[in-house]
């Protein structure tokens, strides 16, 4: 079974598929033992059990009965993780190999339990809308939100908060008149203050029950308030607060988010809910100010942040981090949708999405298809008509005594529960084996790292076991448990270990570690760490003779890894010069969300060539791939770009494709568009689509991604072989040459 087939079954992909047998050997592998785990990975034939799972009796283990358990005819089972003997349920007595319960079936290494405990409340959605925007963009946003109401479950609860200079909490329970409560936009209200202001006795018709907590009137079932909500949305207008010349609009996004998180916490703490922020510009009021209201005050840049010259940055980060921590505690999620050319402060707000599993969508305006389609795709449904999102989840990682959990990197938060299987060596968010997943979807993928605890030699083919238990609130109103159990061999044989290396998963895992380090360390230090790691890995696993460059050889399991690292070093994830702080935060957020294949596309984009005399084919991400008679399709995950070579572009401008005798040219021009459309179908967020040609202004998006093997200062390579890239970046060939020299010289 290859790595991708195993991923399709269990949603797990390891850097090393065989583990070193001792702690000392594990310390020499350079790339840590890690897995990319997608808890809700879609699987057509997923086994489903309509009852509660059976747990190991060992309180330090509590693993779930699984196919790797040994079943005793006497009516007990032995836990493979801790070795505890546990009794089988009475109705399992007398089971045979031909009559196994579903959870013991070998095909049930991943299984979903639908537990008997129902969820007492439906999912909650709270819109937080910025009204400081032009009429056309506000109208487009309102139209999209009204369309989306039909996609929510009918019993879902919904609420509305709007903000400009002030914050308005709308009372959807008021049918006769539109009623809202106004809060100052320059104050941070705590839960008690909000409760005192909003939780007032409500006059009701005689005989009608009255809520003990009247705050519930701000979050009501869509099926009951769709008309009132639609009416309020249709009549929303631009914030009336005057904006003087030379000023930015007064926006109270920080206060609005604080009120929203407190309102959900006071009403539905511990039940799945999403706060959805629609921002058309930066917060210009404290709390949470991103930039001051005067236009003469510039927005912070990467350089300002590095030099500690961004005067609002640390205070804003601290404020939004506090909201994120409170939201995680309550089990809620925050999504951020930006619809403007300006920065809204995604960098400062990143913890709101990062810790709660929320999404970030970055678009130029709410009128764009990037926003509209991305937002509506959030409400995609499964075959049974339920939303493809889980709420208020937890991830519990169990492992056998040979292993310990080092940490997790992804959109989750630590539950700070320490167990015996937690390693002292932390990678990412460590110190625990249990994490909060406020939101989890079939796309959410987590990098989980392990440490070998074993110190003495093991017998050949000794097995280790890892179990991932994901508990979450399903959109159908049930609590579910997705259990994935995997087994890996422990070996002291370096050749066996080498053969088990998955260089694609390893590259993605190392990219996540790199981004995690980038949040804390200087950018140059992070790049040096990446380089040292690559040199050490090659020194350990490459074949070479000391001081002889030409003898350097990497086996097929490692041959692509340096290439991935080269493109990672050049990517927008680490090279922030041409991106705003918000763009960098957005790109990094998405990389931390996606699975192995999508992450690799972000690190090393794919390039497909179309020509008249051959079938479409993948080509090198290299400047030599640009030809006058070719069309190239570039997929960076964030952009889908069609590039027409010089000759093709001239033919297209001349309109040859419209002439009957040039039907083959017309077909050639359509082929990349059809393939691009297929790429756009399921992707979230929706990528930006670019159609350009040789000499076009947007061709820079392609050139910036290409390996510059033909540049202005490399005259010998220029000619018929590709296009000239105007850059001082080193090419992959030069990078590999330097790598070989450093490896064979023994340098670190």
Curated annotation (Swiss-Prot):
Residues annotated for Zn(2+) binding in this entry: 56, 61, 79, 82
Family annotation (SUPFAM superfamilies): beta-sandwich domain of Sec23/24, C-terminal, gelsolin-like domain of Sec23/24, Helical domain of Sec23/24, vWA-like, Zn-finger domain of Sec23/24
Record-level GO cellular component terms: COPII vesicle coat; endoplasmic reticulum exit site; endoplasmic reticulum membrane; Golgi membrane
Swiss-Prot/TrEMBL GO biological process terms: COPII-coated vesicle cargo loading; intracellular protein transport
Pfam families from the UniProt entry: Gelsolin, Sec23_BS, Sec23_helical, Sec23_trunk, zf-Sec23_Sec24
Source taxon at top rank: Eukaryota
Membrane-related topology note: Peripheral membrane protein
Stated role: Component of the coat protein complex II (COPII) which promotes the formation of transport vesicles from the endoplasmic reticulum (ER). The coat has two main functions, the physical deformation of the endoplasmic reticulum membrane into vesicles and the selection of cargo molecules.
Subunit structure: The COPII coat is composed of at least 5 proteins: the SEC23/24 complex, the SEC13/31 complex, and the protein SAR1.
Protein name, entry field: Protein transport protein SEC23
Species per Swiss-Prot/TrEMBL record: Meyerozyma guilliermondii (strain ATCC 6260 / CBS 566 / DSM 6381 / JCM 1539 / NBRC 10279 / NRRL Y-324)
């Amino acid at each position: 079974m290859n790595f991708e087939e195993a991923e399709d079954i269990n949603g797990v992909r390891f850097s090393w598929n065989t583990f070193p047998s001792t702690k000392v050997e594990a310390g020499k592998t350079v790339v840590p033992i890690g897995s990319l785990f997608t808890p809700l990975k879609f699987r057509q034939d997923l086994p489903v059990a309509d009852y509660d799972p059976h747990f190991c009796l060992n309180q330090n283990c509590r693993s779930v009965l699984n196919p790797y358990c040994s079943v005793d005819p006497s009516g007990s089972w032995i836990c493979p993780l801790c070795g505890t003997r546990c009794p089988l349920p009475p109705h399992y007595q007398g089971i045979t190999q031909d009559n196994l319960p579903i959870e013991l079936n070998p095909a049930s290494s991943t299984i979903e339990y639908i537990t008997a405990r129902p969820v007492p409340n439906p999912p909650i959605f709270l819109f937080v809308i910025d009204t400081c925007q032009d009429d056309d963009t506000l109208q487009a946003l309102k139209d999209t939100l009204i369309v989306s109401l039909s996609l929510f479950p009918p019993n879902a609860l919904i609420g509305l908060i709007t903000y400009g200079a002030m914050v308005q909490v709308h009372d959807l329970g008021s049918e006769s008149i539109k009623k809202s409560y106004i809060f100052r936009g320059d104050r941070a209200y705590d839960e008690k203050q909000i409760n005192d202001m909003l939780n007032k006795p409500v006059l009701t018709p005689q005989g009608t029950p009255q809520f003990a907590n009247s705050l519930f009137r701000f979050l009501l079932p869509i099926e009951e308030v769709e008309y009132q909500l639609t009416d309020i949305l249709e009549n929303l207008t631009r914030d009336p607060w005057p904006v003087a010349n030379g000023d930015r609009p007064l926006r109270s996004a920080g206060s609005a988010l604080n009120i929203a998180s407190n309102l959900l916490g006071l009403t539905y703490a511990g039940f799945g809910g999403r706060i959805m922020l629609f921002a058309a510009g930066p917060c210009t009021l404290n709390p949470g100010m991103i930039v001051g209201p005067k236009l003469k005050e510039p927005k912070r840049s990467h350089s300002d942040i590095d030099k500690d010259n961004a005067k609002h940055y640390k205070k804003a980060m601290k404020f939004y981090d506090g909201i994120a921590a409170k939201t995680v505690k309550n089990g809620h999620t925050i999504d951020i949708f930006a619809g403007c050319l300006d920065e809204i402060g995604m960098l400062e707000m990143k913890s709101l999405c990062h810790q709660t599993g929320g999404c970030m969508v970055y678009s130029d305006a709410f009128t764009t298809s990037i926003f509209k389609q991305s937002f509506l795709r959030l409400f995609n449904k499964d075959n049974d008509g339920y939303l493809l999102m889980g709420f208020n989840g937890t991830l519990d990682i169990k492992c056998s005594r040979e292993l310990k959990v080092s940490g997790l990197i992804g959109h989750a938060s630590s539950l700070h529960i320490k167990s015996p299987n937690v390693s002292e060596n932390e990678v990412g968010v460590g110190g625990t084996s249990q994490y909060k997943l406020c939101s989890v979807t079939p796309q959410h993928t987590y990098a989980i790292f392990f440490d070998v605890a074993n110190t003495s030699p093991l017998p050949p083919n000794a097995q280790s076991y890892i179990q991932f238990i994901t508990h979450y609130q399903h959109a159908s109103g049930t609590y579910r448990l997705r259990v994935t159990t995997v087994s890996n061999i422990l070996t002291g044989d370096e050749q066996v270990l080498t053969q088990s290396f998955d260089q694609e998963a390893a590259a993605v895992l190392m990219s996540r570690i790199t981004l995690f380090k980038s949040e804390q360390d200087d950018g140059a230090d992070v790049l040096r760490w990446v380089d040292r790691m690559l040199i050490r890995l090659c020194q350990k696993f490459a074949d070479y003779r000391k001081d002889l460059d030409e003898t350097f050889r990497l086996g097929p399991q490692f041959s692509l890894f340096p290439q991935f690292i080269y493109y990672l070093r050049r990517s927008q994830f680490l090279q922030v010069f041409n991106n705003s702080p918000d763009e960098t935060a957005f790109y990094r957020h998405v990389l931390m969300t996606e699975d192995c294949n999508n992450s690799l596309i972000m690190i090393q984009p794919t390039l497909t060539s179309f020509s008249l005399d051959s079938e479409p084919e993948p080509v090198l991400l290299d400047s030599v791939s640009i030809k006058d008679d070719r069309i190239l399709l570039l997929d960076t995950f964030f952009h889908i770009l069609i590039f027409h070579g010089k000759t093709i572009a001239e033919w297209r401008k001349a309109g040859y494709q419209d002439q009957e005798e040039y039907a083959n040219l017309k077909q050639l021009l359509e082929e990349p568009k059809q393939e691009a459309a297929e790429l756009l179908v399921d992707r979230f967020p929706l990528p930006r689509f670019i159609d350009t040609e040789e000499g076009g202004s947007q061709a820079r998006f392609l050139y910036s991604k290409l390996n510059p093997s033909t540049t202005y200062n490399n005259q010998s390579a220029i000619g018929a072989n590709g296009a000239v890239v105007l850059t001082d970046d080193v090419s992959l060939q030069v990078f590999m040459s330097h790598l070989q020299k450093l490896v064979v010289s023994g340098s670190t």
